[in-house]
């Protein structure tokens, strides 16, 4: 069991704090998907307005969507290094090395023609409804954040 301070909105024993948190989140609910969007100049160490805009959306919506001009697969934006650098700026420091992850704990999602990955929807051309895995993990290994960096449009 994870300790939740009495004044935490996640401590459901404190209905007043939870209700205030819930009302604030509902008031901030994005009207359109574009409300989640931040356009990046290309540097994963982005500073100033871009970083502040991403932080604001994370605080308001618990997520942010970023976009960049179309890129070639061999450009730095296409690399796992870009994603890793960016997510670390937002506190995602411990990556989950699940059974299909690469050595760096980052998974490239593409259609797998064989092997273990072929069995799982993220490595197929079947429709997926994203969720954060890890609900079955122990409390000290729960997944509390996720970074997705799309190089190519979905099939």
Predicted ranges, named:
Residues 2-155:
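Fe(II)/2-oxoglutarate oxygenase catalytic core
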């Amino acid at each position: 069991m994870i300790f939740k301070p009495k004044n935490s909105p996640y401590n459901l024993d404190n209905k007043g704090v939870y209700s205030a948190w819930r009302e604030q989140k509902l008031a901030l609910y994005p009207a359109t998907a574009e409300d989640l969007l931040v356009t990046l100049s290309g540097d994963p160490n982005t500073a100033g307005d871009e970083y502040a805009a991403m932080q604001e959306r994370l605080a308001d919506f618990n997520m942010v969507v970023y976009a960049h001009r179309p890129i070639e697969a061999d450009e730095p934006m296409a690399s796992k290094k870009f994603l890793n650098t960016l997510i670390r700026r937002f506190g995602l420091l411990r990556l989950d090395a699940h059974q299909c992850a690469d050595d760096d704990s980052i998974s490239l999602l593409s259609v797998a023609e064989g092997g273990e990955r072929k069995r799982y929807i993220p490595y197929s051309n079947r429709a997926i409804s994203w969720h954060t895995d890890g609900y079955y993990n122990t409390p000290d290994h729960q997944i509390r954040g996720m970074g997705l960096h799309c190089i190519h449009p979905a099939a």
